[in-house]
Each structure stands twice: as C-alpha cells, then as structure tokens.
C-alpha cells in the first residue's frame, strides 16, 4: 500500500528539548544533544499499523546517523500520558501520534561495538 503515515518534527530549540527531557525519564541526555527528531504517525491513514511504519522510519534514521558517525538514541514514546504530553507540547493534531524520540549528537567518546548475535535465536526452515 505504501501509505507512508509518518511525519517528523525536527527539534533544536533548547528550551523545548529541556521540557521534553522532563517528560521522558529515558531522555535525560536530550538537553546536551545537538538535535532531536520526533517520529509521529498519522492514525487516520493506517490505523494502528502506523506503528510499524514509524518503527521502520526510526530504524532507518538510526542507521543513517550511524553511517555518518552521529550518535543516536531511540527513546520510545509509549501510548499513555507521555504520548499525550508530547502532543500537547508540540501542537500535534489529534490524529497524529508521537511514536519515538530520536536524540542525535556527536559522540563524546568512542565505544566498542558489541557482538549481539545470538545463534540460539536463529532457526532455519522450522523452529
């Protein structure tokens, strides 16, 4: 179908970044970041399936950031008061739902890449 229900809010305003950080317990690094992107979904376009498209869009942004040497953190925006608070703060229309907050910036330090391959979770043809 390729309905593309996602929208993006680019956030660079320091005061706004602080307010968002206050609303999200896992985004405390936000006030020190260079930039953030709020990934949102249009529920009127694809109902609850907007979440799948927003997850793919979020992952693509993370991969692009990594390829450019930019640090990025995916902070989920759950479907409770936090989603409503983000919507009110950023003026989102009722049918637009905050999905994820991506915090971006140049890394302060280089970290070793972890090997997270778990062979016991890979199955071929059958379980």
State each model region's role.
Residues 1-127:
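Acidic, surface-exposed loops and disordered segments
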């Amino acid at each position: 179908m390729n309905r593309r229900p996602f929208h993006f809010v680019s956030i660079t305003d320091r005061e706004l970044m602080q307010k968002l950080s206050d609303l999200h317990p896992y985004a405390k690094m936000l006030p020190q970041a260079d930039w953030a992107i709020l990934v949102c979904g249009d529920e009127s376009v694809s109902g609850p399936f907007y979440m799948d498209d927003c997850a793919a869009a979020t992952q693509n942004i993370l991969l692009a950031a990594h390829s450019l040497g930019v640090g990025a953190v995916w902070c989920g925006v759950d479907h409770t008061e936090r989603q409503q608070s983000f919507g009110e703060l950023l003026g989102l229309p009722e049918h637009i739902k905050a999905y994820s907050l991506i915090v971006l910036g140049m890394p302060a330090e280089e970290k070793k890449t972890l090997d997270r391959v778990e062979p016991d979770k890979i199955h071929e043809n059958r379980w």
